[in-house]
Amino acid sequence: MSFIHKLIQKFKPKKKLVDQVQQAVQEKSFFQANQKSYYQGLNKSANSFANTINKLAANYVTVNEQFQESLFEELVLLDIGYHAATKICDAIVQELKLQRVSDPQLIQEIIVDKLIVYYIQDKLFETDLTVEANKTNVYLFVGVNGVGKTTSLAKLADQLTKQNKRVLMVAGDTFRAGAVAQLAEWAQRIGCDIVLPNPKEETPAVIFRGVQQGIQNEYDFVLCDTSGRLQNKTNLMNELKKIYQIVQKVSSAKPQETLLVLDGTTGQSGLAQAKVFNEFTELTGIILTKMDSSSKGGIILAIKDLFNLPVKLIGFGETTADLAAFDLEQYVLGLTKNLSLNHEPNQT
């Protein structure tokens, strides 16, 4: 059993009786993390992380002020964020001093240990997508332009359809040129039903029709695309609030998921987006895309630290299989695979 696996197991809750809803969730294989995707998709982040940690472990035999400054700088560069980096750095230095550690591998293990403990903070996040049994589940996809919002929706629709679920896509991005055609093409490729906007119809009206149709025809899932909006445009953000209220009115409940799609390569800009979107609507989770192109895997810690929001899905590439459920253990294994920790054999 690997060092990482042992560490994660300490925080896993004891198994409870599985009720109908939990069982429905567990039966859906699209919620499972793909270990191979994590190992291959996190190559850039893993190389960056290993270079950072190996350099620190090799350059400092004693834990002094210079070590602490270097550690803090490296954590910030990994996009962990100033607040989280400060707390994690203090915890690492305290532990290293307490144990009087000078062995480079032990230094690596303590750094990884404190990163995981900080993310978990006494309990594991619920990262499964919410699925209510015997009900139409409505998912809203929100975010700025260019983050992979429409593509992520289509990839999830494909995975759900392959599980024999009835899925209705709603092409609510009426602003971006080509967005409707893009989703319509995906629908044809997947074999999935879609609600398209009428001429000059705005996003809230399209979402209203789509959710209404999904409920009336007893679809399992209604996946709603929305127009990309800049977080500094108040009128667009207010429209998002209106869309959220429309779903509540039509379905007599909040959307099962309101997912903010973030580009994993944008770093602190993504955090600024999350802050504003979270103010205008009740986000339930994050979809982190383009992680195969990112060298800064620490953004997941920053999201957890600032907003207490779970990353629910993570994207590593172009195919539909490259959108995976977020799994902390697989993520950490992928991120630390180039360190000399006690890993299980690498997946290639």
Swiss-Prot record:
Its EC number is 3.6.5.4. It is a peripheral membrane protein. It catalyses: GTP + H2O = GDP + phosphate + H(+). Involved in targeting and insertion of nascent membrane proteins into the cytoplasmic membrane. Acts as a receptor for the complex formed by the signal recognition particle (SRP) and the ribosome-nascent chain (RNC). Keywords: Cell membrane, Cytoplasm, GTP-binding, Hydrolase, Membrane, Nucleotide-binding, Receptor. It is found in: Cell membrane; Cytoplasm. It comes from the Bacteria. Its main location: membrane. Part of the signal recognition particle protein translocation system, which is composed of SRP and FtsY. Signal peptide: none annotated. GTP binds at residues 143-150, 225-229, 289-292. It comes from Mycoplasma pneumoniae (strain ATCC 29342 / M129 / Subtype 1) (Mycoplasmoides pneumoniae). GO terms for cellular component: cytoplasm; plasma membrane. The keyword Amino-acid biosynthesis does not apply. This is Signal recognition particle receptor FtsY. InterPro entries: AAA+_ATPase, P-loop_NTPase, Signal_recog_particl_SRP54_hlx, SR_rcpt_FtsY, SRP/SRP_N, SRP54_GTPase_dom, SRP54_N_sf. Belongs to the GTP-binding SRP family. FtsY subfamily. NCBIfam families: ftsY (TIGR00064). GO terms for biological process: SRP-dependent cotranslational protein targeting to membrane. GO terms for molecular function: ATP hydrolysis activity; GTP binding; GTPase activity; signal recognition particle binding. Pfam families: SRP54, SRP54_N.
